[in-house]
Design a protein with these regions (language model features):
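Low-complexity, glycine/proline-biased repetitive segments and flexible coils/loops
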Residues: 2-374
């Protein structure tokens, strides 16, 4: 995820172009109503109504929408974590869109919500080659009509397992395992119609690559690289650098940062789970990459990478944006931790597992959030 957008999240790209009605502004001409979602038309007092889809459904507009403009956030499922001092899962892509008044939103518009990818399976014995975590699934919305609009957010890439094959990549790339495979690239989603080039640089879609595994500048056995997030690349592994730390202990790389979208902030959705509200926070951070699994034994607990690319308390299960923390292994073994799951409905990646197979975790499910002025 080496290419990162410098755009503010609020500066989303109107990728369907001008409509000829721009001078009319975004005021709704006449009554506008819509239905659908697990949260159906909540009005938190900021002038917008919101529909939140945490599972498949339909966004239904029963009558002529007039000049209404529909804005949305579509997030793919996060990738699953790798196993045994392995890479963290990459976050799902985030697509932030605003449909013009000419878009064919009248009628029934199908929504699918991508599930998170599964963690890498147990290879049968410690330190044996394993398969990567599974990629997350794509999230889509389709506005039918004579010229349908199809919008897709790709699922995140799975984290590489110990000595396993290189991951194929996804929305944001999954982290490489300990011996330092190359970074896993990000894949921008395709959209139809797509009059403008789609790039990893942001604007319409947000995703980043992972980090290579290991860190040649750090002593000790290498750990995995963090999965990429919508707002930043995954990080390299590193020695903790603490006094009296065992030099053979290496901390897994942190996951890449999530991307903020203030118009979709957690406090606007009081009926969503409290951990979801905390992870998205007052700035609406989604799609954090997952931390990688740590390597080695010693007094550092935990030694897994942090989720979401943020400096949260060590041991926190997720970072801002819902990326899972990586697993840590230390002596005595009862203090070891497994990789943590990506938080559902954030698109966060699943944490990588640590040495001696402390276990990896699944990526978080995606989400679709639609809003319009009322």
């Amino acid at each position: 995820m080496g290419i990162k957008s410098n755009l503010l999240a609020s500066a989303y790209y109107n990728f369907f172009g001008a409509t000829g009605k721009d001078s009319a502004g975004s005021n709704i001409a006449g009554p506008f109503s819509a239905s659908g979602g697990n949260i159906d038309g909540i009005t938190p007092g900021n002038g917008y109504a919101y529909h939140v889809f945490t599972s498949p459904g339909n966004f239904t507009v029963p009558s002529d929408p007039g000049e209404a403009e529909v804005e949305g956030l579509i997030i793919g499922g996060g990738g699953g974590g790798g196993r045994q001092h392995a890479g963290g899962g990459g976050a799902g892509s985030v697509v932030h869109f605003k449909l013009p008044a000419s878009a064919p939103i009248l009628g029934t518009n199908a929504v699918t919500v991508g599930g998170g990818g599964n963690a890498a399976p147990w290879p049968g014995a410690a330190d044996q080659p394993g398969t990567p975590g599974s990629d997350g699934n794509n999230t889509t919305i389709t506005f039918p009509g004579s010229t349908p609009y199809n919008i897709t957010a790709n699922g995140g890439g799975g984290g590489q397992a110990n000595n396993g094959p290189h991951p194929t990549g996804g929305g944001s790339g999954g982290g490489a395992y300990n011996s330092g495979g190359p970074e896993v690239t990000a894949t921008a989603p395709t959209t139809s119609p797509s009059p403008a080039a789609i790039t990893d640089a942001g604007g319409k879609s947000y995703q980043n690559p992972s980090c290579p595994g290991g860190n040649p500048t750090s002593p000790g056995s290498p750990a995995g690289g963090g999965g990429g997030g919508a707002g930043g690349v995954g990080q390299k592994a590193g020695n903790p650098g603490q006094p009296n730390a065992n030099p053979t202990v290496q901390v897994g790389g942190n996951g890449g940062a999530g991307q903020p979208f203030p118009g979709f902030a957690g406090p606007l959705f009081p009926t969503m789970p409290t951990d979801w509200q905390a992870a998205t926070g007052p700035t609406g951070i989604f799609a954090g990459g997952a931390g990688a699994g740590g390597h080695g034994t010693g007094p550092v607990t935990p030694n897994g990478g942090l989720g979401g690319g943020v400096k949260t308390e060590p041991g926190a299960s997720t970072g801002a944006g819902g990326g899972g923390a990586g697993g840590g292994y230390a002596s005595p073994e009862p203090t070891s931790t497994s990789g943590n799951a990506g938080l559902d409905n954030t698109g966060g990646g699943g944490g990588g597992g640590a040495s001696n197979d402390t276990g990896a975790s699944d990526g978080g499910d995606g989400v679709v959030i639609i809003r319009y002025l009322v």
